[in-house]
Amino acid sequence: MLMLTSQTIDGKRISRYHGIVTGDALIGANIYKDIFSGVRDVVGGRTSAYERELARARELALSSMASAAERLGADAIIGVRLDYHNLGGTMGNTILVSTTGTAVSTEDEE
């Protein structure tokens, strides 16, 4: 599934707009869990364990959105947007990764 942040696709003409598609993924960022499990891998002020979890959540959200577009018969998603929301929590933070875009069908330009 082709996914782009732009509204156009070079070499393609949009033949049909299927509508808005979304995908979401939640991850728990629990500092206590990291400390006690020994996963604290801080390099240059960054925590790679969190970065890996964010990357995994982003891929899950994008995959969910792509599946929704495929169910509509689309072959591409334009105007893709990714948002990150801190939902808080009692033992750490819960992060929501949310993706939105417009599912479209395309044809080669003549």
UniProtKB/Swiss-Prot annotation:
* Domain of life of the native organism: Archaea
Q: Which positions, given as ranges, span the membrane?
A: none
Recorded protein name is UPF0145 protein MTH_507
Here the disulfide bonds are none
Q: Which family does it belong to?
A: Belongs to the UPF0145 family.
What InterPro entries does UniProt report for this protein, alphabetically?
A: UPF0145_dom_sf, UPF0145_YbjQ-like
